[in-house]
Amino acid sequence: MPKVKKVFIGSGIRHDLVLKDQTYGLQYLKEIIRHHISGQLKVAPEHSEDHILALMGKPPIKSFVEFFRCFQKINRQMGKKQFLTCYFIAAYPGCTRQDMERLNRFNRRVLKFKPRQIQIFTPSPSTPATLMYYTGKAYDSGKSIFVEKDKRNKEKQKNLILKGLSG
C-alpha cells in the first residue's frame, strides 16, 4: 500500500505461539518489537495457575514467562522502552480466591507491575468454559471443579488483582 508508512499491532498477539515456532518465532518477535509496537503490546496470559490454564486450553505459565523475559531482553538489546499490557480473567470456572491470590503474587514477583486489564468471566454460548460454568465439571475429565457464581465474590476475585491482597 503506497501511502501506508507504518503498521502497528493494536489488539495484541498470541504469545504462546510466538516461541512455539522454533523456525521463525524469535525473528517474528524481533520484527514486531523493532517496527510494529507503539509503546505497548497486548498479550493475554489470562492466569498464572497451571490448573486454570489447562481448563482454558492454554499452555503452562512457563510459556508466558519465557515470552515475557524474551520480550524484555530484545527491547533492552534494541534500546527500546516498550511494555506488555497483560489481560487476565477472574472467576473462570475452577478459579478460587486462593488462585487469584497466587496470580497477584505472580504479578508482583515476575511481572513487577499490577495489571489493570482484569475481566470477570462471562459465560458465552457453545464454549467449554460455559459448559464448565453451568455443570461444575471439567470439560475434559468430568471431574468436579469449583465455580464462583456469587457476584460479590466474583468482584472480590477481580479486586484482588486491581487493589492487591487486601481486596
Can you describe what each PLM-predicted range is?
Residues Y24, Q98-E101:
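Short, glycine/acidic-rich beta->alpha junctions
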Residues I33, R108-R109:
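Non-catalytic positions within long, well-ordered alpha-helices that form the structural scaffold/packing
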Residues E101-R102, F106, K114:
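N-terminal intrinsically disordered, low-complexity, charge/repeat-rich segments that act as generic
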Residues G167:
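Acidic, glycine-enriched active-site microenvironments
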Residues M1-T85, A90-P93:
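Conserved SAM/AdoMet-binding glycine-rich loop
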Residues L17-K20, E46-K58, G79-Q98, L111-E148, ...:
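Flexible glycine/acidic-rich beta-alpha junction loops that bind and position SAM and/or redox cofactors
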